[in-house]
C-alpha cells in the first residue's frame, strides 16, 4: 500500500525541471523551474539548450524540494521519473539523476510514461473518476484520443500524422512574431477578435480519428503572405480565427469518437488544455 509512503517524482521531458513529493495521496511539494525565458529568444525549445538547463538546475531543485517538505533523502520510499516520450537529452538528465537518488538510498525506482501522466492528471481534481472514459491529450508534441477502458488498459483511437496542436500554435506564432509559447501568445492576441472573421480549413485525414495540422498552418501563412494591405483584418481577428480552427479540429474528432463508442465520461490533459477556448467548448460538449 502507498498510503503513507513518500514518493519522489521527477519530470524533465521538455523545458521544465519539475519535482513533486507526495505522502500517499497528499502533495507535499510541487517545484517547477521553467525555461520559457531561455527559449523565448529562439522562438521555440532548443533540445541541446533544454538538456543543459536541466543539468544545471536539477540538483538545486531537488535539495530545495526536500527542504520545503522538511524531509531528509533517507525519508524517501519510492523514486520515479518520466522516461518518455519527450526530448531525449532532457529525459536522460532526469532519468540519470532520479536513478542515482534511488540507488544511493536503495529504494525502488519507477519510470512513468509522460502521456499516461497527462491521462491521469484529472484525478488530481476528481479522485472519484473511474474508467471507462475518453481522454483528449493535447501537448506540445502529441495530440491523441485515448479510450481508457480501465487503469493500465488504454486504446489509442487517434493521433496526429504530422504536427501536434501545440506545434501548430508555436510554429505560426514564431512566423508571426507573436511570442513563445505560441498557444498562450495567440490566445492573448486573439482576445476580443472575431473567430469567424477568416475562413481557415479544418483538415481531415483518411483515418477518421487522426489529426493533421500542417495544412492548417500552411493555409494560415499563405493567407498572411497574400493579404491585401487594404483588407481590414486585425491581429486579434487572425489569432482568434486560427485558434478557433485548431479547437474545432480537436473537438470534431474527439466528439465523434465519444459518440461512436458510447462512452459517458470524458477528460482532457496536456499543456494545450490550458487554452481557455478549448476548455470552454469542451465543457459545452460535456
Describe the function of each predicted region:
Residues 86-105:
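DPxDG-like acidic metal-binding loop motif
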Residues 2-7, 12-13, 20, 29-30, ...:
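A short helix-loop
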Residues 7-9, 80, 90, 133-137, ...:
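Short glycine-aspartate micro-motif
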Residues 82-84, 101, 139, 266-275:
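Glycine-rich beta-strand-to-loop/alpha-helix junction loops that act as flexible
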Residues 81, 109-114, 182, 268:
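General beta-strand structural signal in soluble alpha/beta enzymes
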Residues 72, 188-266, 275-285:
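A contiguous, well-structured pocket-lining segment that forms one wall/lid of small-molecule binding clefts
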Residues 1-5, 112-134:
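Conserved phosphate-binding catalytic cores of ATP/NTP-utilizing and phosphoryl-transfer enzymes
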Residues 2-85, 118:
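N-terminal beta-alpha supersecondary unit
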Amino acid at each position: 500500500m502507498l498510503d503513507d509512503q513518500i514518493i519522489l517524482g521527477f519530470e524533465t521531458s521538455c523545458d521544465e525541471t519539475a519535482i513533486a513529493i507526495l505522502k500517499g495521496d497528499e502533495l507535499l511539494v510541487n517545484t517547477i523551474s521553467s525555461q520559457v525565458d531561455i527559449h523565448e529568444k529562439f522562438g521555440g525549445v532548443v533540445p541541446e539548450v533544454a538538456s543543459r538547463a536541466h543539468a544545471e538546475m536539477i540538483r538545486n531543485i531537488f535539495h530545495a524540494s526536500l527542504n520545503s517538505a522538511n524531509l531528509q533523502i533517507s525519508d524517501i520510499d519510492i523514486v520515479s521519473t518520466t522516461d518518455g516520450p519527450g526530448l531525449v537529452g532532457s529525459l536522460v538528465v532526469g532519468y540519470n539523476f532520479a536513478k542515482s537518488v534511488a540507488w544511493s538510498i536503495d529504494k525502488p525506482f519507477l519510470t512513468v510514461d509522460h502521456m499516461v501522466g497527462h491521462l491521469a492528471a484529472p484525478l488530481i481534481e476528481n479522485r472519484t473518476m473511474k474508467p471507462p472514459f475518453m481522454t483528449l491529450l493535447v501537448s506540445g508534441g502529441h495530440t491523441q484520443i485515448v479510450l481508457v477502458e480501465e487503469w493500465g488498459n488504454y486504446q489509442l483511437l487517434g493521433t496526429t500524422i504530422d504536427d501536434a496542436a501545440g506545434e501548430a500554435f508555436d510554429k505560426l506564432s514564431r512566423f508571426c512574431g507573436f511570442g513563445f509559447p505560441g498557444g498562450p501568445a495567440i490566445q492573448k492576441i486573439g482576445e476580443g477578435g472575431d473567430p469567424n472573421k477568416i475562413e481557415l480549413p479544418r483538415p481531415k485525414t483518411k483515418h477518421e480519428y487522426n489529426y493533421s495540422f500542417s495544412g492548417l498552418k500552411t493555409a494560415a501563412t499563405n493567407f498572411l503572405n497574400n493579404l491585401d494591405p487594404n483588407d481590414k483584418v486585425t491581429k486579434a481577428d487572425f489569432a482568434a480565427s486560427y485558434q478557433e480552427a485548431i479547437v474545432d479540429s480537436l473537438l470534431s474528432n474527439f466528439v465523434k469518437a465519444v459518440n461512436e463508442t458510447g462512452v459517458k465520461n470524458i477528460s482532457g490533459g496536456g499543456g494545450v488544455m490550458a487554452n481557455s477556448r478549448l476548455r470552454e467548448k469542451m465543457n459545452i460538449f460535456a
